[in-house]
Structures are given as structure tokens and as C-alpha cells.
Amino acid sequence: MQTYRTEGNYRSADRLSAAELRTAMASHEILQSTALAFDTARQLRFELGGVRAVMPFEQCADGAETGSVRDIAVLTRVGRPTCFVIEELDTDEAGQPCYRLSRAEAQRMCKADYLDALRPGDILPCTVTHIEPFGAFCDVGCGISALLPIDCMSVSRISSPADRVSVGQQILCAI
């Protein structure tokens, strides 16, 4: 069974062998790598085990194919760990091998197998990704965001969520 984590906490695909990558592809294992670029074809570029990999825009986040994800949300993945499943091994226009990746599929798997099964009172590990005056946005698994409202952070009055949490901090949250 797949264990779902926040982005940055999956097995890195950067130095895996071709055989290990094929095994991960066959089992739909969620891996991660740092996105190297967002190109003019609107796809994220990676390198896995010395082989080029691309993630088409529609596969960069669940909802991207319907237009509910903006380019800036994908562009901000560059230089950061990004989780995905390997969809296929294809060849590019030059005849070189190229992996096709999907973060959207990893997110759909996380929702269906993990998040949708949570009940009130369940505790889940989160990573704070962004702080606003009204609360903190947290990665609850595979880059899926959830809001932790300011009034749920403290029993005493605080002026800012930054009084209790910081970006990158790993916390436990109750549903």
C-alpha cells in the first residue's frame, strides 16, 4: 500500500537506475524530483537517472486540465521538490528516451486512498507552505493544500499565524 506524504518527503527519483524507475512506473509508486524548468510548451522539466522527463501542464496538478490551476501555481514548482508518478517512457523528437510524469495522478491517488478516508478527530502530518493574515496554507499530501485558519492555531489571541508557525515547518493537524 502507498504511504502518502507531503511534497519533499518522497523517495528521490534523481539517482534511481532505469530498472528502479521501471519498477516504480509499473507499481505507480509516488516519487519526487526537483523541477528544473517550466518551458514554452508549458511543461515542467526534470532529469531522472540521467534521462530527461517532462510533466505536461495538464498533469502538473489535479484540476489543471479544467483550467482551475493557473500557470503561476505550476511555475512556482521550479527549483522545488515535486511529487509524481511515472506515466510512461517515450522518446522525444530527437529519438532520446523521455519519461512522462503526472503530479495530478499522484494527487488523485492521495485524495482517493488517503484524504477522503479521514474522519473528524484524525491527525495528519502537514507542512506549512504559505502564511496569510487569516491562516496558514498547508500541504496535506502530494502538494494538496488545505487552510489552517488562524482561530484554530491557538487558544490565546494571536496577531498573525506567523506567531505560531513558519513556512516549511512540519506540523500535526486535526481534522
Across the structure, where does each feature detected by a protein language model lie?
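Single-stranded RNA-binding regions, centering on S1/OB-family and related RNA-binding modules
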Residues: M1-A174
